[in-house]
Amino acid sequence: MSISFSNVDFINSTIQSYLNRKLKSYGDPKYAYLIMNKKKPTDVVIISNYPTEWVDIYRNNNYQHIDPVILTAINKISPFSWDDDLVISSKLKFSRIFNLSKDYDIVNGYTFVLHDPGNNLAALSFMIEEHRSEELEEIIQNNKDKLQMLLISAHEKLTSLYREMSRNRNNSKSQEADLFSQRENEILHWASMGKTYQEIALILGITTSTVKFHIGNVVKKLGVLNAKHAIRLGVEMNLIKPVGPAKARS
């Protein structure tokens, strides 16, 4: 199934929260996770904790077309470091973006690369700030395998969320298994209607602990932080099927 990535705010924020959480143990580095369709490079998604102004300028000017880091990543499989010399060594004459990046102290970095089955380039770049260069370089060098796996897991989560959104938007009538079990869907439905766990338990004739158990499974399936995020994602992506009226059981 071909997936078309777009800038869906909630999905992007979900992935950014995931990356922020995972990167805390690596010193909270500045990062940019970029996904670009190699057949249609104008289709790009950027999830980053770089300065917002820099990300907006990059996206609005389609700088992925002239970014030496991205142009190098297209032809790479293994991770690589970069700085001003990349423009010279790669014989790319696109120094304009590096001149802009200097204004935001984005001069040196390290990029991890992934090419997915949908012909997309996924690149996770870390900015190595000058005042922390030795510390961050050592962290990256000692954890390259873990950071590469982080890119893979983040991209898998992103792909899964967009795939599910695409299925629901197209009202697919295939017989593939539902994302949620019947009970999980019922609980999500009532939670999205503003019911408390105790009220849901009464409506469905189950215990509050059972409600919490199923909500925990939903949170895991969606790869989000908590029940509130799961309910919001379920509503925004139309993942929750309507259920019939239920009477409280005594």
From Swiss-Prot:
Residues 173-238 form the HTH luxR-type domain. Belongs to the autoinducer-regulated transcriptional regulatory protein family. Gene3D superfamilies: Transcription factor LuxR-like, autoinducer-binding domain, Winged helix-like DNA-binding domain superfamily/Winged helix DNA-binding domain. One of its GO terms (molecular function) is DNA binding. Functions as an OHLL responsive transcriptional regulator that acts in virulence (soft rot disease) through the activation of genes for plant tissue macerating enzymes. Disulfide bonds: none annotated. This is Transcriptional activator protein ExpR. PANTHER family: DNA-BINDING TRANSCRIPTIONAL ACTIVATOR DEVR_DOSR. Residues 197-216 bind DNA. Keywords: Activator, DNA-binding, Quorum sensing, Transcription, Transcription regulation, Virulence. Pfam families: Autoind_bind, GerE. GO terms for biological process: quorum sensing; regulation of DNA-templated transcription. It comes from the Bacteria. The gene is expR. InterPro entries: Sig_transdc_resp-reg_C-effctor, TF_LuxR_autoind-bd_dom, TF_LuxR_autoind-bd_dom_sf, Tscrpt_reg_LuxR_C, WH-like_DNA-bd_sf. Coiled coil: none annotated.
